[in-house]
């Protein structure tokens, strides 16, 4: 077995799609939280939770923290099952034990990072080279606490076997990465045939000057590179070879920065096509990097950390002229580089935005927008133009680059004598010209020169290296080691495995393809340790005859050395013999203490103890001795020094669990036993936790619960597939045999233990079943899905105290009685509703015989004065609550009944809709008005129905039942309109309107004022919206600060008769306030629209209208629709004369029945009403006021009239059509009306027939038709009472985008532009998610991006996530007359913004009344209203 096969025995890396992202390289993206950056792996469910702490914690082992620990960013090891059930446990690891072992090794290494510069650089390099730039925005760490914030290091190692698959699939991940892609330039130089001396004078002059002045070789290489790029004549072969040899000399000690001229530099030359100033681009790149290289050469990790904290490009020296002089340039945004000829100004080619560094480079801190990466296909031979890329189109891993960074630490400790951040080249555009000019092979890219020369004995990439000779000294030493191992352990088969592993040809692709030596070595050591302990290939192993081998693999010696330290060193400590051949390597490097008996650490069964020796190792002495032994092993000293830094932490983790005691001697455990020891130690910590680990293998049908620990086998007999290897591989001498310290190698577990264990399994299973039953009882309980009587579940045997049977029976009886009485009440409501809907009469006998609502049904704490539920009172309280029943003694039945209305007051839900409608994320259905108010009510319907018929459980008891319907309606008139009214008896005999009760208590305990509800009629239900919204905070101060100080003052106190003529007054307000538009923008808009209609608008200066059964909003001014001579009541009309005397509304007492009802809805006009009247009056007002009685034209046969009025000019047709779209246009209705051919709606036909035939209509119909208008009036009043107002948004299909635009403060953008920007941001955000989920989201986004497509609720969620704001959506419950919270954001620290949703089809922002709203929103709304009106009259 070769090394590759050994690693593959632990990893699932076969048959991967080379075009897909590697399985072992999960997509890690950042999710912003209030505390920091939360890293999320987007593959699937986590198997390891982030709460894992310390695996091994005792006196001899340094306490280590797991990679999945507390500080952000947190990472979770995730699992995606293969289609084949035989593969994969974790992606990249086969078993939980292997994962524990990996994590244990990795964390022991990382725990030494503060004192181990090589490990520290490996961690830094891992984070840099993998391009996880987003993980560093909020998760940066210093080298001092590197072991507590591992960022993406440990998951990459664990999932991929230390980057084995990540780096092996480098071609798939980074298609144009120079490292590991091109061939060895150095080998070509060695084999190139010279073609004579150099005959080029310029080149000879450069070389002569270099010799004369003893110039450094890097300066020589720089001069030669400049000459090659500037020359325009062919270069002879001899000259090319001489230049190549000089480059080889320079690259042997230093990598000239000029060779990196394809890298992104501030504003210069990236991605230019070959025909575009290619020569200048090459020279600029070379000089620029040459001048800046020294600034970053030799930085150590500490100073390097300081440079990483800068998030913008700073102090960049750029070349400004052909002389090579430089000038500092500091930039923080769009780069403008001023250059002198012959360098052109290139600032238009590349746009930079200040961003955190994409590779943590202290030099490059910019995000690239390349304009020449792709060119538009040119039609008809025209010149092509640059194509600008949006940020979401830039794939950073393919387009990013950085400067080389050399550190002193790696100069001293690594193979490379320096390392650099990987250079991501896309097409080698510039270097190709230079390389082709020299005639060098296409696979000899200069970046690889440094790679090859700095990798010691690793010489190739694409091919397996040739084996090295197996020297006699090595043969003897290896034979002694194997013989010693077999003699001490008796494990000849394992010795054969190790021998063949070392002998086989092979090299880890990871080891040669890495971007820095520390990362390679870290992964290499961990993988080799795992392979040495767990690989199980035994094919072809039949002897230990070393004479059959003359060669060993190129890395065999390093593998052998790792095996010596991890396996033979513990054996050497405890052996009774004296292996003299190992004394020079291990003698005097350790000290053993006395036996330390550990009786219960990790024991799963009685007697299964983990015993260990107290071992103290002098790692300094061990390092010196192993380096001195390097000659025997034929391993370079510096290689031993590097490997020791990674092996020693692993050794310290293994040694305490590497021994077991026998009666006469102590022996080293089998390597599998070491893993078992670690696993058992973990089981003590996690085996009996509240959140138990996931149990079972991963198969396509398995479902791994979220947030579970990795499986620590609690009952191995249930999973023999994971224990057969441990038991068989050790020939019965496994860890479970350590049951008795004094026993002589027991081979089996005693039967008594097995019996106790089986009994324990049964008891635990029984307890789990009982706990599940209890949970199910709590979850299933309720009465929403069951129609029968209460179901008594038979008691389940459990370890709970028994419940008194009499108590159970009593509780059952009381519950059944309560539910029955609830059924009677709701049957009454249902029967009443049915009679109203069908138009039938409600039998008087039913009213007499039906039982009244039980007094104790809703026991609430009621204030004696306000009759409202006192704050803090339990809305549903009964004696049954006092009975503390066991959770699962019986199952409460599920009945299809709704809770009493009072039960929902604490839930902020409407009374008439079940809670299920609001528990789902979808928005609730808004039932049509006709379902609750039927226009064709029978005239003789009794007015004295019980309160339940009106669904008003909280009406004051002293309110007469025979009040007109207005007594039960909301909103009510304002205080000024009714406070002087004494309430006279109407002509129809109705009782006078009672005086309003005393002010009610607000939820906070303060007395309600006039602003608590609509002034005038103090109704309890008017207090309800404020009670509901009292807990909702006002919009954030940030939103108020964002808005302009120029406020459009909609309401001015008092009526100013000397106001400007461009202002319009609306004297229809009861409280005498005048509504004006004072903004200059609004004035201009109103004046322009008024001028357009000045030929049509005729408004009487003394308007008097007759109150009839036609809704007031639709009455034509100065025209009566009722019979001539009918008694008139004054109605306020819009006056053309600002100084005119506007008649105030009549007292409330003068109105009766439907008139009172309509007046209650006719509250102070809002801005919408003003705008509506501006558009509708020209239609509803005739050309001249009628001078005499209205003449009724003859009625035609078809119900119409013989009058020749054109139907399309009927004023009420237009008015009704417009009123259907009263405040917001439901898009479907608007589209239907715009496309209408004039047939009209049913409302149009009925209203037109009434007007032309002069037919009286009942008041019930009038109320129903004006319901939409009334509802908006009620909503406006409710918002006003809470100090809120709407931001009027057009209902043109973009209402959601306009609403979010307002919240985001994007006042200068149009809704279309904001929509495009938001959808683009969502596309970028989901780019790194799981492909299946990402495709679904992108498909939905593409659908939303189409024209005339409304926004969806998902956009609100993404908007909150991307913009860092909370959005709370509320809706208007037309039946309950209150606001209902639908979707709320409860993230702590995020200020909420409020949106109101109308009938699931229109969104508008809600702001405080003093919020300044930009003029642009009002202007857009007026324009939309005007277009809507024009579409209605066409």
Swiss-Prot record:
InterPro entries assigned to the protein according to its UniProt record, in alphabetical order: OTU_dom, Papain-like_cys_pep_sf
Lineage per the UniProt record: Viruses, Duplodnaviria, Heunggongvirae, Peploviricota, Herviviricetes
Disulfide bonds: none
PROSITE patterns linked to this entry: OTU
Protein name as annotated: Uncharacterized protein ORF65
SUPFAM superfamilies recorded: Cysteine proteinases
Positions with biased composition (Pro residues): 1183-1192
Segments forming domain OTU: 1284-1409
Position of the signal peptide: none
Region Disordered: start-end pairs: 724-753, 848-1087, 1111-1148, 1182-1207
CDD domains per UniProt: OTU_RDRP-like (cd22792)
Ranges annotated as biased composition (Acidic residues): 734-744, 1055-1069
């Amino acid at each position: 077995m070769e090394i590759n096969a050994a690693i593959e025995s632990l990893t699932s890396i076969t048959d991967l799609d080379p075009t897909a992202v590697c399985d072992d390289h999960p997509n890690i993206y950042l999710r912003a939280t209030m505390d920091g950056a939360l890293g999320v792996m987007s593959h699937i469910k986590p198997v390891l939770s982030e709460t894992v702490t310390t695996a091994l914690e005792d006196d001899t082992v340094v306490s280590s923290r797991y990679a999945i620990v507390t500080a952000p960013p947190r990472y979770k090891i995730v699992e995606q099952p293969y289609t084949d059930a035989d593969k994969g446990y974790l992606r990249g690891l086969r078993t939980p034990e292997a994962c524990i072992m990996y994590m244990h090794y990795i964390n022991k290494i990382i725990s030494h990072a503060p004192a181990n510069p090589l490990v520290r650089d490996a961690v830094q390099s891992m984070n840099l080279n993998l391009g996880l730039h987003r993980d560093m925005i909020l998760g940066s760490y210093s080298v001092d606490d590197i072991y507590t914030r591992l960022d993406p290091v440990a998951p990459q190692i664990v999932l991929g076997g230390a980057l084995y698959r990540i780096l092996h699939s480098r071609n798939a991940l980074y298609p144009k990465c120079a490292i590991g892609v091109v061939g060895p330039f150095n080998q070509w130089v060695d084999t190139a045939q010279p073609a004579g001396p150099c005959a080029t004078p310029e080149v000879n002059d450069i070389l002569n000057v270099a010799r004369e002045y003893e110039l450094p070789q890097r300066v020589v290489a720089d001069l030669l590179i400049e000459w090659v790029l500037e020359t325009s004549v062919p270069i002879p072969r001899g000259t090319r070879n001489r230049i190549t040899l000089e480059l080889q000399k320079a690259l042997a000690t230093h990598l000239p920065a000029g060779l990196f001229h394809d890298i992104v530099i501030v504003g210069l030359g990236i991605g230019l096509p070959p025909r575009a100033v290619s020569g200048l681009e090459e020279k600029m790149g070379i000089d620029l990097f040459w001048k800046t290289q020294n600034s970053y050469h030799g930085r150590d990790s500490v100073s390097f950390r300081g440079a990483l904290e800068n998030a913008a490009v700073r102090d960049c020296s750029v070349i400004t002229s052909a002389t090579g002089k430089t000038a500092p340039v500091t930039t923080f945004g769009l780069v403008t580089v001023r250059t002198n000829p012959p360098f052109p100004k290139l600032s238009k080619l590349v746009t930079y935005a200040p961003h955190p560094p994409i590779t943590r480079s202290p030099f490059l801190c910019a995000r690239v927008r390349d304009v020449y990466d792709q060119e538009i296909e040119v039609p008809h031979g025209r010149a092509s133009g640059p194509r600008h890329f949006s940020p979401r189109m830039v794939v950073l891993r393919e387009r990013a680059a950085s400067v080389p960074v050399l550190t002193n630490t790696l100069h001293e400790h690594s193979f490379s004598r320096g390392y650099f951040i990987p250079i991501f080249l896309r097409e080698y555009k510039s270097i190709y010209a230079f390389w082709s000019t020299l005639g060098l092979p296409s696979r000899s890219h200069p970046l690889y020169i440094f790679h090859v020369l700095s990798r010691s004995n690793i010489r190739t990439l694409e091919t397996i290296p040739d084996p090295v000779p197996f020297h006699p000294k090595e043969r003897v030493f290896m034979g002694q080691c194997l013989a010693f191992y077999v003699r001490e352990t008796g494990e000849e088969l394992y010795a054969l495995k190790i021998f063949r592993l070392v002998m086989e040809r092979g090299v880890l692709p990871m080891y040669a393809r890495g971007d820095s030596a520390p990362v390679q070595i870290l992964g290499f050591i961990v993988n080799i340790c795992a392979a040495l302990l767990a690989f199980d290939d035994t094919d072809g192993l039949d002897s230990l005859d070393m004479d059959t081998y003359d060669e060993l693999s190129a890395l065999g010696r390093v593998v052998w050395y790792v095996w010596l330290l991890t396996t033979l060193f513990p054996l050497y400590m405890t052996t009774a013999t004296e292996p003299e051949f190992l004394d020079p390597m291990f003698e005097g490097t350790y000290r053993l203490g006395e036996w330390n008996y550990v009786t219960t650490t990790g024991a799963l069964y009685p007697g299964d103890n983990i015993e260990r020796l107290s071992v103290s190792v002098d790692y300094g002495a061990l390092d010196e001795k192993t380096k001195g032994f390097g000659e025997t092993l034929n391993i370079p000293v510096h290689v031993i020094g590097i490997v020791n830094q990674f092996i020693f932490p692993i050794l310290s983790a293994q040694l305490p669990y590497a021994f077991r005691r026998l009666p006469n001697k102590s022996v080293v455990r089998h390597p599998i036993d070491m893993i078992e020891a670690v696993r058992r130690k973990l089981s003590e910590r996690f085996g009996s936790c509240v959140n138990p680990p996931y149990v079972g293998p991963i198969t396509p049908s398995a479902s791994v619960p979220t947030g579970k620990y990795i499986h620590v086998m609690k009952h191995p007999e249930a999973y023999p597939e994971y224990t057969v290897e441990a038991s068989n591989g050790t020939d019965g001498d496994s860890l479970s045999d350590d049951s008795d310290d004094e026993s002589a190698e027991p081979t089996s577990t005693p039967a008594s233990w097995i019996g106790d264990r089986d009994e324990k399994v049964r008891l635990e299973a029984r307890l789990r079943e009982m706990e599940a039953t209890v949970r199910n009882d709590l979850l299933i309980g309720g009465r929403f899905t069951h129609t029968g009587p209460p179901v008594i579940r038979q008691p389940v045997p459990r370890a709970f105290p028994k419940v008194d049977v009499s108590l159970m029976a009593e509780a059952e009886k009381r519950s059944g009685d309560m539910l029955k009485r609830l059924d009677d009440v709701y049957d009454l409501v249902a029967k009443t509703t049915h009679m109203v809907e069908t138009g039938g009469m409600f039998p008087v006998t039913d009213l007499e015989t039906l039982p009244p609502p039980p007094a104790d049904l809703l026991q609430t704490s009621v204030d004696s004065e306000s009759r409202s539920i006192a704050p803090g009172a339990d809305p549903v309280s009964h004696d049954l609550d006092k009975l503390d029943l066991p959770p699962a003694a019986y199952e409460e039945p599920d009945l299809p009944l709704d809770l009493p209305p009072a039960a929902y007051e604490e839930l902020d839900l409407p009374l008439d809709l079940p809670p299920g409608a609001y528990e789902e994320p979808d928005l609730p259905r808004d039932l049509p008005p006709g379902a609750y108010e039927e226009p064709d009510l029978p005239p003789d319907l009794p007015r004295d129905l019980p309160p339940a018929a009106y669904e008003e459980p909280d009406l004051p008891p002293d309110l007469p039942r025979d009040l007109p319907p207005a007594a039960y309606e909301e909103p009510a008139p304002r205080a000024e309109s009714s406070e002087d009214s004494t309430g006279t008896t109407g002509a129809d005999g109705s009782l006078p309107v009672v005086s309003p009760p005393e002010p009610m208590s607000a939820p906070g305990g303060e007395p309600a004022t006039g602003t608590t509800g609509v002034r005038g009629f103090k109704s309890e239900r008017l207090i309800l919206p404020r009670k509901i919204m009292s807990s909702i905070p006002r919009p954030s101060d940030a939103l108020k600060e964002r808005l302009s100080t120029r406020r459009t003052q909609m309401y001015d106190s008092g009526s100013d008769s000397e106001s400007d003529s461009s202002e319009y007054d609306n004297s229809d307000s009861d409280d005498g306030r005048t509504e004006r538009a004072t903004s200059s923008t609004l004035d201009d808009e109103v004046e322009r629209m008024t001028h357009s209609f000045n030929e049509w608008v005729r408004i009487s200066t003394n308007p008097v209208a007759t109150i009839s059964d036609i809704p007031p909003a639709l009455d034509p001014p100065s025209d009566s629709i009722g019979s001539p001579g009918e008694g008139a009541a004054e109605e306020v009309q819009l006056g053309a004369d600002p100084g005119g005397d506007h008649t105030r509304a009549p007292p409330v007492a003068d109105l009766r029945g439907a008139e009172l009802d309509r007046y209650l809805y006719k509250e102070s006009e809002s801005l919408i009403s003003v705008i509506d009247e501006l558009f509708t009056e020209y239609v509803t007002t005739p050309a001249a006021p009628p001078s005499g009685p209205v003449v009724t034209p003859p009625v035609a046969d078809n119900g119409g009239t013989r009058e020749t009025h054109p139907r399309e000019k009927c004023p009420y047709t237009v008015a009704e059509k417009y009123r259907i779209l009263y405040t917001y246009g439901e898009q479907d209705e608007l589209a239907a009306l715009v496309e209408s051919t004039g047939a009209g709606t049913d409302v149009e036909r009925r209203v037109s027939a009434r007007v032309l035939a002069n037919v009286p209509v009942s008041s019930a119909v009038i109320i129903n038709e004006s319901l939409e208008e009334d509802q908006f009036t009620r909503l406006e009043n409710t918002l006003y009472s809470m100090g809120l107002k709407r931001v009027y948004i057009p209902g043109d299909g973009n209402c959601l985008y306009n609403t979010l635009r307002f919240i985001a403060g994007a006042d200068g953008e149009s809704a279309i532009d904001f929509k495009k920007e938001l959808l683009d941001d969502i596309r970028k955000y989901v780019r790194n998610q799981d492909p299946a989920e990402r495709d679904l989201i992108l498909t939905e986004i593409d659908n939303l991006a189409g024209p005339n497509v409304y926004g969806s609720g998902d956009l609100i969620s993404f908007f909150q996530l991307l913009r860092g704001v909370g959005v709370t959506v509320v809706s208007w419950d037309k039946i309950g007359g209150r606001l209902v919270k639908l979707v709320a954001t409860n993230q702590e620290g995020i200020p909420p913004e409020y949106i109101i949703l109308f009938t699931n089809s229109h969104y508008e922002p809600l702001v405080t009344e003093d919020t300044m709203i930009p003029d642009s929103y009002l202007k857009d709304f007026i324009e939309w209203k005007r277009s809507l009106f024009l579409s209605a009259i066409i």
